[in-house]
Design a protein with these regions (language model features):
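Conserved beta-sheet core of the metallophosphoesterase superfamily
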Residues: 78-79, 85-88, 164-225
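N-terminal active-site segment of His-dependent metallophosphoesterases
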Residues: 1-78, 146-150, 155
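Active-site environment of divalent metal-dependent phosphoester hydrolases
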Residues: 42-49, 69-75, 92-99, 112-113, ...
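Beta-strand-turn-beta hairpins that frame and shape the catalytic cleft
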Residues: 25-36, 111-121, 153, 200-207, ...
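Active-site neighborhood of phospho(di)ester-bond hydrolases with catalytic His/Asp-centered motifs
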Residues: 37-40, 63-68, 86-93, 107-108, ...
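Short, well-ordered alpha-helix to beta-strand connector turns
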Residues: 60, 83-84, 103-104, 151, ...
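Short amphipathic alpha-helix with an adjacent loop that forms part of the alpha/beta core around
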Residues: 49-57, 113-115, 142-148, 219-224
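Conserved catalytic scaffold of divalent metal-dependent phosphoesterases
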Residues: 20-28, 41-43, 87-175
Length: 225
């Protein structure tokens, strides 16, 4: 009932969270990389042959799995993509043991260097219910991200919070936003929202929402497709 009331509440008194942050302009990394991103398939990949074709015979440097991927989908993914080319995090609908069951390392909180580009990640979503699932309160995400080294690209399941729309499931995490500002991160790639769009924060960070399967090409530190 609480969530229903929050969803139905009009979008009034919205807080512009970005306006509370010091506007540190991003540090561009001026390098190229192609990322195959998979997020929020929820079992659709195993049922959709056209979707499966998107991961056949394409060139990319790294496959980034951003969470909410069904078991059947993982079976398809691992038939087509070698594990050594995959980094994966959990979404809010994933069980904690999922990645281990499929022999994948949990990339949550880790950083990898690809083509001289540092890529890090944070799993899960804002903790909007009491049950245990991959999630953070705003306070927990503060402590988690403070321990992460500087990165050029931050992968996440949830989005950065920009406005408080009183929608705890999809508003995002404040401290993803603060991390992007404080560390001057040029790019954030996330899932969770079930839309595909490219946006930009006020400090210049490009924010790319991935839905299902998308190949993202980055040229000279900017997303171009």
């Amino acid at each position: 009932m609480l969530l229903k009331r929050l969803f139905n509440k009009q979008k009034i008194d919205n807080m512009d969270y970005e306006s509370t942050l010091k506007n540190n302009w991003i540090k561009p990394f001026n390098k190229d990389i192609s990322l195959l991103n998979i997020s929020d398939t929820h079992g659709d990949l195993a049922l959709n042959k056209e979707m499966q074709k998107k991961i056949n015979n394409i060139n990319y440097d790294l496959c980034c799995i951003l969470g909410d991927i069904h078991d059947y989908d993982y079976k398809i993914i691992l038939e087509k993509i070698p594990k050594e080319k995959i980094v994966a995090i959990l979404g809010n609908h994933d069980r904690f043991s999922l990645l281990k069951e499929y022999g994948l390392d949990d990339f949550n909180g880790k950083v990898i260097d690809v083509n001289g580009i540092k890529i890090g990640a944070i799993q899960g979503s804002f903790k909007y219910k009491e049950e245990k699932f991959p999630s953070f309160t705003h306070e927990e995400s503060i402590n988690f991200l403070q321990m992460m080294p500087d990165v050029d690209i931050l992968l996440s399941h949830d989005k950065p919070l920009t406005f408080d729309y009183r929608n705890p499931v999809h508003d995002g995490l404040k401290w993803i936003t603060k991390f992007l500002y404080d560390r001057k991160v040029p790019i954030n790639i996330h899932g969770h929202i079930h839309k595909s769009y490219l946006d930009e924060l006020k400090n210049g960070t490009q924010v790319k929402d991935v839905y299902c399967i998308e190949l993202i090409k980055i040229k000279k530190g900017k997303i171009v497709s």
